[in-house]
C-alpha cells in the first residue's frame, strides 16, 4: 500500500494516498463547440458579454466598472466555486465546519491572525474605489451561488454542504499573504543555535546577507525556544523553510536586446503545485479598464499581466515583515482584568487581551478556543515553566495588507510614475514587480510594507518595550531601477539590494543559482524572442551541479574510485537536469548528502546543532566550506566521496541497481491529485529541472512540490504574440472540459497565446455567455 501524502488545493490540506507516476499525459482536446448562452441576473445594470476562448480564459466586456467586476465574480465562481469557498473558509477560520476535527487548529490560527483594525483605514489603503469594486465582485459571486441551484460542483456533495453568500470582507483575508511576511521559523532556529553554539558560530553557519553580526538582546534567555514555540503559526502561516519552496523568476529586457525592438517581459511565479490551479486567467474590459492576466480567483483584478500600455510581473522579495517577541508573564495587579494573567511592557504589567471563539466542527461538538493577544500581536504559545509567552508581530495587522487587492491600482497604471505610485499601495506579500511599457521603457520596484527596526530581526526579541518598530519605510524609498544600462532587469528571490542601499529589508534570500543562470543567458550577445524566453523559463542547467560535481569527480579520482559507474556517470554529465538522463537523479541525492557530510563535520562537537540544520541544504555555506583553504584536502575529499557513497546507496535503495531505471523524468514528477476523490485525479507529469534551476521544479522525495504552475511572456511589440501557461486548467470543476485541458501543454513545456485584441479574441472564442440584468 502506498504511503499517505498530503494533497494541497488552494490553501486547505487533506490526507490522500499517493497517485501513481506516469509519463506526460495524453492531450485532452477541447470539447466545447462554439455556443451562445444567456444568464439573467439581478444586480447587473447593463448587458455584459463574456467570451471564453478555447483555453478557457474569459474575456469580459462590460459597459461600467460595476458590471465588469460583478461579471468577474460571477465568472470566477462558475469556474472555481469550490476552491473559492474553501479559501474563504480558510481565511475566516471555518474549515472545520466542513472538514471535521482535523481542521480545528488551522481554524484557530486563521482567527488568531485575522485583521481586527479600523475598517475605514483598511478600505482607504487600497484606493478610493476598491470597496465598491469588491462589493460588485462579491455580488457577482453571490449571483452565481444563487443561480447554480443544486447543480453545484461535485465536491460540495462529497462534503455535504452548500456555499454561503459572501460578504465584502471575504477578499480582505490575510491568510494567503502571511506565509511570505518574514522569518519566524528561522528566528527560532537561530535562537536554538545561539543557545548551543553562541552568536558568532551561528552567524558562520547561517550567514546574513548583507553581512551583519547577530545581535542577541541583552538579558533575554533564548533557551527553551523551539519550533513548538511558534504553535500553529509555524505550520499554518510561517515561511515553509529558511530557503522557501515558493520562489519565482522574472525578467524584462529592453528593445535593444529583442528582435522586435520592443521590450519583452517574462514571469513565472512559483507556488505549491495543486489541483485546481492557484492562478486564474481573465481579461477585463470596460471604460477605464483593459487588463488581462492572472490573479487569485477569490479577488478582483489581475495581479500579473498587462493592460494596453504596460506589462508587469512579480517575484517574492522576502522582506522581513514580522518579529518573534518573548513576553514575560506574571500575576496581574489587584483589580486588573486578565483571565490569562499579565505581561511586562515598558515597566508595567498589562493584562493579556483574550477573545473566546466557538469553532463549529463537522461530526463533533463545537470547540471553544481562547485567542490571546499582547500589544505586539497574537500569542502563539505559552511556556508556564519559564513564565513567558511567544507573540508574533506581523504587518498583517496594518490596514491595506490583504493579498493582491493593491493590484487594482496597478491594473490601471499607464506610465512609470503611475506604476510607482500604485506600488506604494502594495504592502503584503512583498514583491519584486517588473515593468515594461509600449514606449520602450523597463523598470522594477520592490513593493511592500517594511518595518523600521534598530536591530537585525534575525533573532527573537524581548517584549518589554525595548524592541519596537519605528514606523515603516516609505514606499518610494524602497529599491527600484528604471532603464538600466544593462538593458535588462531580472529577479529570482535573490538579494536585490543596490550597492549602498542603507535600509536592509532582509538578511535572508533564496540561493543564487537561478539568478546566475538567468544573467548568464541575458548577458550573452544577440537579441531575444518570445520563443527564447520560453526556453529560458524551462532551462534545466544546474549552476549548483557545475560548482559541486567536478569536485566530487576529482575527489573520487584521488581516492582511486574514478572507474566506478556512478563517477563515470557524473564525469560525462552536462549539468542539465534533463528528464532523459540518469545523472540528475544521482545528483538530486548527492547535493544534500554533501551538505550533510560537511555540516556534520563542521559541528561534530555539537550533534544537536548538526541535527537542527542537517536538512537545510545551505549550499552557499557549503561552497565556502569546500573552498576553505584551512581545511585539509583529505578532509574535504572524505566528505565528497562519503557523500557520493551515501547518494548512490540512497538511489539504489529507492530505484534498484538497474541504472536505466534512474532516468530523472521517470522519478521526478508533479502530481495532481484531487483533494477529495481519486475519481478526479489527474496523471502525474514527468518533469525536468529542480529547485535550483530556472525551471524551478523543487520538492522532496523527487516529487515537484512547488514551481511555476503559471507562466507568462509578454511581447510589447504585439500583445497578441504574448504566451502563457496555467495548470491543470482554468476550471476547478471536474465536469468541465477546461478542468485538465492545459495539463498536456504544461507537461511538455508548451504555451498558448494570451489573446488580447478584440479580433483575436473573436477568432479564438469557444463560447459566448451573455449576462443580462433582470
Task: Tell what function each PLM region has.
Residues 245, 284-310, 314-472:
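Glycine- and hydrophobic-rich flexible loops that cap the catalytic core of alpha/beta enzyme folds
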Residues 68-72, 109, 117-132, 391-393, ...:
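Second-shell loop/turn segments in exported
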Residues 1-15:
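Secretory targeting and sorting signals
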Residues 504, 508-564, 646-774:
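Terminal end segments
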Residues 14-18, 27-264, 269, 275, ...:
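Substrate-recognition/specificity elements adjacent to catalytic centers across diverse enzyme folds
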Residues 322, 388, 428-525, 577-579, ...:
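Hydrophobic alpha-helical segments
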Residues 589-670:
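Charged, long alpha-helical assembly modules
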Residues 67-100, 108, 313-370, 467-514, ...:
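Gly/Pro-rich active-site capping loops and adjacent beta-alpha segments
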Amino acid at each position: 500500500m502506498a504511503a499517505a501524502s498530503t494533497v494541497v488545493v488552494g490553501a486547505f490540506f487533506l490526507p490522500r494516498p499517493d497517485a501513481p507516476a506516469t509519463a506526460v499525459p495524453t492531450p485532452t482536446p477541447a470539447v466545447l463547440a462554439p455556443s451562445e448562452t444567456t444568464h439573467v441576473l439581478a444586480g447587473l445594470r447593463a448587458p455584459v458579454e463574456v467570451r471564453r476562448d478555447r483555453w478557457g480564459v474569459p474575456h469580459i466586456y462590460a459597459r461600467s466598472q460595476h458590471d465588469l467586476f460583478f461579471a468577474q465574480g460571477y465568472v470566477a465562481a462558475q469556474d472555481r466555486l469550490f476552491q473559492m469557498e474553501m479559501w474563504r473558509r480558510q481565511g475566516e477560520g471555518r474549515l472545520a465546519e466542513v472538514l471535521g476535527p482535523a481542521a480545528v487548529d488551522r481554524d484557530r490560527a486563521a482567527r488568531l491572525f485575522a485583521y481586527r483594525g479600523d475598517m475605514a483605514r483598511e478600505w482607504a489603503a487600497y484606493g478610493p474605489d476598491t470597496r465598491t469594486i469588491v462589493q460588485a465582485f462579491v455580488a457577482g459571486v453571490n449571483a452565481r451561488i444563487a443561480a447554480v441551484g443544486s447543480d453545484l460542483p461535485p465536491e460540495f456533495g462529497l462534503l455535504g454542504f452548500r456555499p454561503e453568500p459572501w460578504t465584502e470582507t471575504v477578499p480582505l483575508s490575510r491568510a494567503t499573504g502571511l506565509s511570505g511576511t518574514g522569518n519566524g521559523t528561522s528566528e527560532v532556529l537561530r535562537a536554538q543555535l545561539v543557545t548551543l553554539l553562541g552568536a558568532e558560530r551561528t552567524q558562520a553557519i547561517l550567514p546574513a546577507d548583507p553581512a551583519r553580526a547577530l545581535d542577541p538582546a541583552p538579558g533575554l534567555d533564548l533557551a527553551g525556544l523551539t519550533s513548538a514555540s511558534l504553535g500553529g503559526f509555524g505550520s499554518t502561516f510561517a515561511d515553509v523553510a529558511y530557503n522557501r519552496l515558493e520562489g519565482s523568476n522574472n525578467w524584462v529586457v529592453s528593445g535593444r536586446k529583442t528582435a522586435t525592438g520592443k521590450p519583452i517581459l517574462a514571469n513565472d511565479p512559483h507556488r505549491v503545485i495543486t489541483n485546481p490551479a492557484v492562478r486564474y486567467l481573465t481579461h477585463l474590459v470596460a471604460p477605464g479598464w483593459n487588463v488581462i492576466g492572472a490573479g487569485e480567483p477569490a479577488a478582483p483584478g489581475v495581479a500579473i499581466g498587462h493592460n494596453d500600455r504596460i506589462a508587469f510581473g512579480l517575484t517574492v522579495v522576502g522582506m522581513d515583515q514580522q518579529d518573534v517577541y518573548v513576553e514575560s508573564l506574571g500575576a496581574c495587579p489587584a483589580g486588573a482584568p486578565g483571565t490569562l494573567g499579565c505581561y511586562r511592557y515598558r515597566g508595567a504589567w498589562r493584562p493579556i487581551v483574550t477573545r473566546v471563539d466557538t469553532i463549529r466542527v463537522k461530526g463533533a461538538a463545537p470547540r471553544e478556543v481562547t485567542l490571546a493577544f499582547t500589544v505586539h500581536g497574537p500569542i502563539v504559545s505559552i511556556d508556564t515553566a519559564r513564565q513567558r509567552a511567544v507573540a508574533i508581530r506581523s504587518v498583517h495587522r496594518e490596514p491595506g495588507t490583504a493579498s493582491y487587492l493593491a493590484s487594482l491600482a496597478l491594473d490601471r497604471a499607464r506610465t512609470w510614475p503611475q506604476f510607482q505610485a500604485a506600488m506604494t499601495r502594495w504592502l503584503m506579500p512583498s514583491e519584486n514587480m517588473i515593468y515594461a511599457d509600449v514606449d520602450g521603457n523597463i523598470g522594477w520596484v520592490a513593493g511592500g510594507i517594511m518595518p523600521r527596526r534598530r536591530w537585525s530581526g534575525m533573532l527573537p526579541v524581548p517584549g518589554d518595550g525595548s524592541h519596537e518598530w519605528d514606523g515603516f519605510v516609505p514606499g518610494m524609498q524602497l529599491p527600484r531601477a528604471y532603464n538600466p544600462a544593462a538593458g535588462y532587469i531580472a529577479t529570482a528571490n535573490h538579494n536585490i539590494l543596490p550597492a549602498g542601499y542603507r535600509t536592509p529589508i532582509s538578511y535572508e534570500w533564496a540561493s543564487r543559482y537561478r539568478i546566475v543562470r538567468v544573467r548568464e543567458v541575458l548577458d550573452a550577445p544577440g537579441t531575444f524572442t518570445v520563443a527564447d524566453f520560453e526556453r529560458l523559463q524551462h532551462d534545466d542547467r544546474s549552476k549548483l551541479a557545475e560548482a559541486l560535481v567536478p569536485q566530487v569527480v576529482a575527489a573520487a579520482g584521488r581516492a582511486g574510485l574514478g572507474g566506478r559507474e556512478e563517477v563515470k556517470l557524473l564525469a560525462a554529465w552536462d549539468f542539465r537536469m534533463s528528464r532523459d538522463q540518469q545523472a540528475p537523479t544521482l545528483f538530486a541525492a548527492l547535493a544534500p548528502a554533501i551538505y550533510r557530510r560537511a555540516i556534520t563535520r563542521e559541528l561534530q562537537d555539537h550533534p544537536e546543532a548538526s541535527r537542527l540544520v542537517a536538512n537545510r541544504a545551505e549550499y552557499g555555506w557549503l561552497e565556502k566550506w569546500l573552498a576553505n583553504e584551512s581545511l585539509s584536502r583529505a578532509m574535504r575529499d572524505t566528505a565528497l566521496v562519503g557523500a557520493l557513497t551515501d547518494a548512490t546507496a540512497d538511489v539504489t535503495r529507492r530505484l534498484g541497481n538497474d541504472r536505466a531505471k534512474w532516468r530523472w523524468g521517470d522519478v521526478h514528477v508533479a502530481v495532481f491529485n484531487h483533494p477529495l476523490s481519486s475519481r478526479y485525479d489527474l496523471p502525474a507529469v514527468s518533469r525536468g529541472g529542480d529547485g535550483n534551476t530556472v525551471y524551478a521544479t523543487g520538492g522532496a522525495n523527487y516529487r515537484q512540490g512547488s514551481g511555476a504552475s503559471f507562466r507568462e511572456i509578454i511581447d510589447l511589440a504585439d500583445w497578441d504574440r504574448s504566451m502563457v501557461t496555467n495548470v491543470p486548467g482554468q476550471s476547478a470543476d471536474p465536469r468541465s472540459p477546461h478542468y485538465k485541458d492545459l495539463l498536456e501543454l504544461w507537461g511538455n513545456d508548451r504555451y498558448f497565446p494570451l489573446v488580447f485584441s478584440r479580433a483575436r479574441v473573436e477568432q479564438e472564442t469557444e463560447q459566448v455567455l451573455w449576462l443580462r440584468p433582470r
